[in-house]
Regions:
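Short, solvent-exposed mixed-charge patches
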Residues: 1, 156-157
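Auxiliary, metal-adjacent structural segments of Zn-dependent hydrolase domains
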Residues: 2, 12-77, 84
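Stable alpha-helical elements in mature extracytoplasmic
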Residues: 39-43, 92, 96, 116, ...
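Sec-exported extracytoplasmic/periplasmic mature domains
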Residues: 48-52, 101, 105, 125-133
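Short pre-active-site segment immediately N-terminal to the catalytic Zn-binding motif
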Residues: 80-95
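Active-site recognition of the HExxH zinc-binding catalytic motif
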Residues: 93-107
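Post-HExxH zinc-binding segment in Zn-dependent metallohydrolases
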Residues: 108-147
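Short, low-complexity, Pro/Ser/Thr/Gly-rich segments in the mature regions of secreted, periplasmic
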Residues: 146-156
């Protein structure tokens, strides 16, 4: 059984869920300008270092360059990314993992409002903590700590 071309109808979501539950992995593709493809490689290397690449390939088919806002496109199992947003590989990798968690929740039929964003942000923080522990690069460790501090800041007293 092939992964559905789109994940929109009840039947398509059911098919996607069955496949992911049985270990299906996408051949992740990056679509965009050569500059975009090159810039996406950095966060993907970090995702591989942290051991999250299979998680990404389970739920996301494509990372596509767009001119607008970066976002998850559930019906395409795609992350749309603006090349101008690709300035911090650790933050970008966290964004990709956060959107992957949202796609997982969508396929599993979990509510994608209310608590979904909390789950996705927790997954992002978990990823950054894991990357910090698994990398041997002191510069990446330092940036992970800075990124974690940013995510753990309390905006209100």
């Amino acid at each position: 059984m092939d992964f559905p071309e789109r994940v929109y109808t009840k039947e398509e979501v059911k098919q996607a869920r069955e496949l992911t539950e049985n270990g299906y992995k996408h051949d992740l593709t990056i679509k965009g300008s050569p500059k975009f493809v090159a810039k996406v490689e950095d966060p993907l290397k970090l995702i591989k270092t942290a051991g999250y690449y299979d998680f990404l390939r389970t739920y996301i088919k494509v990372i596509r360059e767009i001119g607008g806002l970066s976002q998850l496109r559930e019906q395409e199992a795609a992350i749309w990314f603006n090349v101008k947003a690709l300035d911090d590989p650790i933050d970008n990798a966290g964004f990709i993992i956060q959107k992957t968690q949202q796609m997982k929740d969508f396929i599993e039929g979990r509510l994608y409002y209310e608590t979904a964003e909390i789950r996705a942000v927790k997954k992002r923080i978990e990823f950054i903590e894991t990357l910090r522990k698994k990398t041997d690069d002191p510069g990446i460790k330092k940036k992970c700590i800075e990124n974690l501090e940013k995510w753990n800041e309390q905006p209100f007293p």
